[in-house]
């Protein structure tokens, strides 16, 4: 079993679809192998970027089975199992616990119901007490409509099956969690633009969307940090920041899929209610990524960091 302590650069991987909007496992295998070769050492499968709300129960189970086989222990694998139904979250997490190659579950703060902090504690305590696998909390208030407060995270970090958090919030909140969490509780930022700063503050790393496109650059940034080359690491983060932001200028994961499709990974379009970028949007995205205007309308090279190399 791969563990969180070994991972710093995790990709929240897209779910590729074919022209009939069925999961394309060949494309998933091609993309996964490429990301591992480039320096990714962990994955979230079936998360926000994986369009999990549009996947059926059976599709998720098959996706997780196939993905566990594809990765085959080469990186840590975290599978999304959370929902706004506590009983269903427990049931589904225990199904996923039986799948080879899935190391952890990811349980989101319940969306739509808008639980308060006491309700969140009750929900996650019930999950903790009734599941057969370790899991991470997913705190993403921009999508769930509610924020798990830092004190609540620290309280829940004491529970046996809760091994970490994907935290999409301020750096100040992350600092508090890192300072007060239980030993062995791993903290990951879910904000690409915080990748370097979060690591400096003591987080384990980042769960990233941009790493689909900039794995090599992000790995180089972390390596520079570990080698004490702080100006180089900072330069890479500055280069990445605007590009990371650009990948969210339209509803995600449509932008990252547009880039991957141009690079030949055949991830397909998003399922409704999201739509693919049109040509005008692709031109605008390309401009914000520092590419030629028509770059996403034709074949795109895999290495998009050459101007960083020449900087």
UniProtKB/Swiss-Prot annotation:
Stored Gene3D superfamilies: Aldolase class I (3.20.20.70)
Q: Where in the cell is it found?
A: Cytoplasm
Q: Does the keyword Lyase apply?
A: yes
Q: Mind listing the UniProt keywords for this protein, alphabetically? A: Amino-acid biosynthesis, Cytoplasm, Diaminopimelate biosynthesis, Lyase, Lysine biosynthesis, Schiff base
Q: Give the EC number(s) listed in the UniProt record.
A: 4.3.3.7
Main localization of the protein described in the UniProt heading:
cytoplasm
Which GO terms label this protein's molecular function in UniProt? 4-hydroxy-tetrahydrodipicolinate synthase activity
Keyword presence, ATP-binding:
no
Indicate the secretion signal residues: none
According to its UniProt record, in which pathway does this protein act? Amino-acid biosynthesis; L-lysine biosynthesis via DAP pathway; (S)-tetrahydrodipicolinate from L-aspartate: step 3/4
Stored SUPFAM superfamilies: Aldolase
* GO CC entries: cytosol
Indicate the quaternary assembly. Homotetramer; dimer of dimers.
Name this protein carries in UniProt:
4-hydroxy-tetrahydrodipicolinate synthase
The record lists the organism as: Lactobacillus helveticus (strain DPC 4571)
